[in-house]
Amino acid sequence: MTGFLSLRYITITVGLLVGIGTALFFNAGTLFAQITPPFYSIEYRPYKGPWMQLKTSHFRIIYPKGLDSVAYKSGRILEQQYPLAQSLTGGNLKNFPLVITNYSDLSNGFVQSWNFKSEINLAPIKGKALNPRGGDWLEAVLSHEILHATHGNIKGHFLLNSFGLLFGPDLTRSLNFYPPAGIHEGIAVYHEGKNSLSVNHGGRGNYGYFKAKYWANLLSDSPWSIGDGLIPTEYHYPLNRHYIAGYFFTEWLQETYGEGVLKESLLRHYNRFPLGLGVALKGVTASWPNAMAPVYRKWALDNYAIAHRARNKTQIDDVDYINPLNKELDQRRPLWISPTKLLYVERKPHQERGIYLYDTETQLRRLITSDFFVEDYLYAVDLKSKEIIYAAYKRGATSFNEVYSYLYRESFLEGASKKALIPGSKRMFAPSVDSHRNSLWALKNYLNIAQIYEYRNNNWLQCSQFKNTRPIAIAIHPSMKNTYAFLMQKRGFQGVWFVNNINSCSEIMSSLGGAADIGFDNASIIDIQWHPIKSTLLMSVDDRDGVRVVEYDLYNGQAFVKLDAEFAAYEASYSEDGKLFSFVDEQNQKNIIAVVDSSRIAANSFEWPTMNAIEIEKSSNSVLLGNDLLNSSTNWKIDSYTDDRSWWSPRVILPQIIDQSSFGSEDFSELEVGLFMQSTDILQERGYRFLGTLYRNNLWYQMSYSTKKFRPGIDFTFYRRPNYFIFSPEEGASVDLISDERGWSLGTPLSYRFPSLTRFSSISITPLLYVEGLRYIDGSGSFLSDYVVQTKYGLSSFLQLRVQQLTRDIQPRSGFITFISSQKTFKASQGSFTLNNNRYTYRLNDKYAIYADQKMYLPVWKKKNISILANAVILKQSKNLLFSTNNIRSTGFYSPVFPNSSYIGRFSTETIVPIWYADQGFFTVPSSLKAVYLKVFTHRMYDLANKTNIGYPTRTSFGAELNILFNISNITLSAGFGWYYDVLEKKSDFFIGSF
């Protein structure tokens, strides 16, 4: 499902590895620094008021002050749904945290296994992603997420559960998240239609818009296999296919093998998790997935035939499609601006989403604007000013979780001025132009619903005071004055309310407060659009098994089905003169806009009776989920949320085994062993990491505490870590020693994120202070000297400027990334040590280092997602080196590159050529193949400290690597093999790995 995420997985990605490498570089004891990635990110939350908590029998609901009614409603929904969810998954919950936030308009809900909790944004999902008959936002999202929560806490054999005592609770619990994501989402979507609203055909399993995408693929030449449908896709449409196929596979399993099949299989998987869910299903059903596949496909085909056999499908000839040759396409919302020209929204895998102008006569199109549009894609056309008005999301400056919608104006004339923000439009969406009142109407997020506003005379006025009704869209007749249609959801019903003769926007509540004027039995109206001339309203109506285009005549009260396509047709509109008719046609892996002569549509229409007033009233008053707990919930108590001390105990404990042979000295080749521990509080505003190890008869440690309970936050670290170095007591002699570095560091991260979500820009600056004592140790671990204290200060800065990475990009296709770090000691220090009865004096000279890394991404062939990275790096240090020169060196050289130089530069290029976007899943073996790509690279190193008559000394290497992205369970991995050539050494070699 596009709109809210339901799971967070810990994934091993290239980005994560880069992050670890960065952490290693900036610890002086590079080889001994933490090698375990942080499992819990520390987050700054924009809400800084008091947090409250409501405790129920099984849940702990944490929310901003003032949202008590939302918390109680959430608690009742969760408690009512808990036994239903438990019966499907078998998992148990106790004191499970749910965090509710209201500082984002981007709808989201998820359950995470690491720091086990659920979190939802109050902003309801926009657009068509959820079945309107499933109730309001809280009912939909909570009844979905509770399935993930119970699934995530399945307990199996005692032996496996006891690992929680050894390795922390989160590592053990994460075993439940190893099955394919489509199983997680499939069973949750299945439950949406099995909760107490199922009698009203709620949930996406009873939603034709959702099911049409599956059926379009099922009847195509390339249907998804079981494995394909259960893995998330990053490269092919629809991007939510694991929700869709996961639901159908779950429904088939439950129908074929009984309601307990997944519950038993999930428990069996937990106890045998390395074998995967396919083997677990075999143990329960006695059938391997390859034997299930033909039976499952036949069931799906029969399911489609039964659902569609009574439908009167529209047969239309001479249909023109926009970009019909594209295999994968997402086109939405055609709106006409003349008899032959229309605007529409489009996205392809190699391009961002934009609003385009299309001429039906010339078949030429032109991009008007691109942005991160609100997902209902509702925009308005102002024909007087020749402008479009649309809603787009922008990021907050302080937190990734802070996202708000705004309204913008932009001319659709060629060469016109750029877009302009409409004042006061924060959190608004779904605009509609009222040419009769010279005003603009829009909706504004309000908790889990929305309110109606009008912008007139440069002022916004609130026009509604809804509590249990959510407006979806506003349609204003372009030629008939005082004729308004409001598409709204009221409980499990979604229909149309008409309003006439408005003098003040506040008058609309007298018409909108009652029952709807139009509705259809066991169906939902999901979008509306007026005829430009006539008194008829076009509507897309979802009737559980498909989406039809229906036209309603305002004067005679009759509704006619104008179009019933093979799978789904929606978002229809007439041209300015009414002669042409456009709609979105659902096809395999694409939504494509069709244009046809309107007379051909009229010839195939047939009447569809609307509901009467009594039926509408009854459908609009379904009981809220959890309403049967109204009385008992009065015993639940609200108090202030305060951190309990449970987060002090580690949430994850992992053994550490570090091979120190990388020191390069046989005398010091030995395993360093120890433990890594980490934890965080529920809100993830603060946390700690601890790494303790034993090496050379000494205890080494690194204890870090981070907090972002205030801005900008602090990072504080105590450490004792070793660093290897070579001491030369006399000419031609050398001794290997270890420097024992003990101290603390303090950093204050200052960051700012720019608002664009289509091209990411941010800046981060972190001042650092180190106070460190240094002494020397011999190979046996004996101390040779006392500590000498040295103080260092540093500055780390990170800039990302207009970085863009689209659906099929392996690396960013454009943008700049700059990383600069510097360190400098305050003053020189002096010490001494004794070795072989000789006393040596050493001086820690005043040292400094500046590391600068500039990356520039450039598109080579946008349509094929081919891009190049140009990377320039310098490392300038004092003569007494502060950092190892290996930090700037790239793999591909046979021997050390300028190891003693104080000023080194490197220029590299990496060209990424995607070869195959596989997106293939394997169900019996818990794995999937994501993509295969070629990387061609060049590296040139410069010794900038030693210029000669012919220039700077250089070293060059080049090569290529074939890389494979794949998943084992839900862990993303990268493997490759390649070849490189060292020009100076005149040697080449093959390698296995990835760099």
Question: Where do the language-model regions lie?
Answer:
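Outer-membrane beta-barrel translocator/channel fold
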Residues: 570, 588-590, 714-766, 772-785, ...
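Residues that define the transmembrane beta-barrel architecture of outer-membrane proteins
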Residues: 669-673, 696-701, 738-746, 785-795, ...
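Outer-membrane beta-barrel initiation region
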Residues: 602-716, 797-813
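A flexible loop/linker signature enriched in serine peptidases of the S9 family
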Residues: 201, 205, 327, 346-355, ...
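C-terminal outer-membrane beta-barrel translocator/porin domains of Gram-negative envelope proteins
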Residues: 718, 723, 729-731, 782-929, ...
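Beta/coil-rich, acidic/histidine-enriched accessory regions frequently appended to metallopeptidases
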Residues: 38, 42-43, 51-53, 265-386, ...
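Acidic/His/Gly-enriched intrinsically disordered linker/tail segments
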Residues: 43, 115-117, 133-141, 149, ...
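Juxtacatalytic substrate-recognition/specificity segment
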Residues: 33-174, 180, 197
